[in-house]
Amino acid sequence: GQTVWPDHDMFHSSDTICGSLMARSKAISGGPVYLSDSPSDFIPDNILPLIDESGKIFRPSAPAIPTLESILTNPLQSGKDYRVSAPTGDEAVSIICYNLNTSPIHKEVKTFVSPKDYLVPKRTTGYFPADSILVFNWKKQTAEILATDKEMKLKGFTDCLFHLCPIRQGWGIIGIQEKYLSPATVQLLSRTNETLTLNVLCAGTLRIWVESQGKQELRSILIKKPGKIEISK
């Protein structure tokens, strides 16, 4: 198991350039979260997606690491995207794609997410093959089947957070959409072809992908308090 967890250092939630970017980097790093703002300057929109109502941090199952093609990349000067991934929750993999280039020449870079991004972490986390892979764009709050590489552009000093969620027995479990690490907000208790039982760890909007009788649906379920929930197709 993981014996050392990194400390990703402090950040300012009120930083107008990269406050939200740094918050997401803290989330996927798995390290502690601490702020350098004056409390009067705290930006709740950047802080609350990190934690539950009691202040407990939603963490990945292991610290994020660079994806294979990013290991030897200088993210500030390469002119390329920089990507990191971490296993999250019971079954998902979370990925952040960055444009961290400081030169105006590289104001826009191409990046991607791939079904292969889900396959790499399974070697160490015990994941097993899925029927298909769902990709959830956290910023846009949209989901789609990821059958091939999905390319996009990152404009400016920015990032994009994705969750790759396996679809098994017609269920794709995303989690609470308001939290950065959505898959870490739920625990899978049981799953059949007809029902899904979860332990939801915080209030918010639960997003579940459902496939039944040839139809696909991205459901939004309002969760008012943490606890066990059973969902039927």
Which residues does each PLM region occupy?
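Generic, well-ordered alpha-helical scaffold segments in large soluble proteins
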Residues: 27, 31, 50-54, 138
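Carbohydrate-binding surface patches
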Residues: 26-29, 34, 72-131, 161-168, ...
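C-terminal beta-strand-rich structural cap/linker in extracellular carbohydrate-active enzymes
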Residues: 145-188, 206-208, 215-233
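Flexible loop/turn segments at secondary-structure boundaries
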Residues: 11, 34-35, 41-45, 67, ...
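Active-site-proximal helices and loops of the catalytic beta/alpha 8
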Residues: 46-65, 69, 125
